[in-house]
Amino acid sequence: ENWIMGEAGSIAAMVRMTGDDATSMFEMITIEEVDGSLVLHIQQWDPGMVARTDGPQEMELVEITDNSVKFKATSEGGMSALGYSHPDADTFIIHVENPGRPVFDIPLKSRSIWK
């Protein structure tokens, strides 16, 4: 998950999910300032840029703290809520809530793309 620095009222991320020497999914996330709050849009693609849905899922801000943010879905999609936290300088945690399932966390560690 790679985030582009915020500028002009927006921030964006590109995600690539890999495993077993193959890419299984790409994801684009944007967060924009809208009417004094934040709106998140998220969309996923299979390899070959085959969209998994007709369009992005939209979420609205429900909570923000010094080191976390949480959004809830306002349109149809795979998630009912999505959050992020940054408990320390090297850790970034994605909090995913799917309908009818408990929240699961995806902890990420900082790493260089220039290995």
Residue ranges and their predicted role:
Residues 2-75, 115:
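Central antiparallel beta-sheet cores of small beta-barrel/beta-sandwich binding domains
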Residues 10, 79, 89-92:
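Coil-to-beta-strand transition motifs
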Residues 76-79, 99-101:
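Glycine-centered tight beta-turn/hairpin loop motif at sheet-sheet or coil-to-beta transitions
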